[in-house]
Amino acid sequence: MKVKKHRFPGVYIVIDDDGSEKIATKNLVPGQRVYGERVIKFEGEEYRIWNPSRSKLGAAILNGLKNFPIKPGSTVLYLGIASGTTASHVSDIVGWEGKIFGVEFSPRVLRELVPIVEERRNIVPILGDATKPEGYRALVPKVDVIFEDVAQPTQAKILIDNAKVFLKSGGYGMISVKSRSIDVTKEPEEVFKEVERELASYFEVVERLSLEPYEKDHALFVVRKP
């Protein structure tokens, strides 16, 4: 087994003895597992295997994502942080110099995040409604990246509204879109085109990527604020 750097800073490729490749992040909190992920040690460092079936961002990277604006030192607003599966890998990437402000609507789900953030001090959990960014405006500074994973019909509008308040000029948004959450009566491709048009009303749309086979009827969009 060996580990090499991915072209995205903070992401690694683990090559198993059978030649299969997986992606991973270097564990910011050695010894901590967040979601039962496989942890390996290589040359004195600990790496957490990033499971693409549990993380839309992980799926996007494995599917050949070209634009990944989250880097070491980035400040990230994470909408729909849930119990922190993907956010824990983002935490590894941004490191102690970076910060994640994670908004979650469900108190029950946010409670599951508490044991993780006790050790991962670069994650700030916020109980809030992503459709109402004014509600957490006092808690979140201007950010480099907004990542959104909120399965709601208005998910494109949610990203735009939050970007107007929090995203730096030239900053990036990333949004995981589940077509069935927007309109179950339409074909996914039709829904994705409508979302792209809505996003393009405010952002420059940089990339769109299918998350199949890891997530059915999902796409990830990368956008840039002018």
From Swiss-Prot:
Binding residues annotated for S-adenosyl-L-methionine, in chain numbering: 85-86, 104-105, 129-130, 149-152
Keyword Methyltransferase set for record: yes
InterPro entries the UniProt entry points to: Fibrillarin (IPR000692), Fibrillarin_CS (IPR020813), SAM-dependent_MTases_sf (IPR029063)
Record EC number: 2.1.1.-
Alphabetical list of PROSITE patterns matching this protein: FIBRILLARIN
Keywords: Methyltransferase, RNA-binding, rRNA processing, Transferase, tRNA processing
Signal sequence coordinates: none
One Gene Ontology MF term: rRNA methyltransferase activity
CDD domains named in the record: AdoMet_MTases (cd02440)
Gene Ontology terms describing biological process: box C/D sno(s)RNA 3'-end processing; tRNA processing
Subunit annotation: Interacts with nop5. Component of box C/D small ribonucleoprotein (sRNP) particles that contain rpl7ae, FlpA and nop5, plus a guide RNA.
The protein's role, per its UniProt record: Involved in pre-rRNA and tRNA processing. Utilizes the methyl donor S-adenosyl-L-methionine to catalyze the site-specific 2'-hydroxyl methylation of ribose moieties in rRNA and tRNA. Site specificity is provided by a guide RNA that base pairs with the substrate. Methylation occurs at a characteristic distance from the sequence involved in base pairing with the guide RNA.
Protein name as catalogued: Fibrillarin-like rRNA/tRNA 2'-O-methyltransferase
Organism of this sequence: Thermococcus gammatolerans (strain DSM 15229 / JCM 11827 / EJ3)
Record gene name: flpA
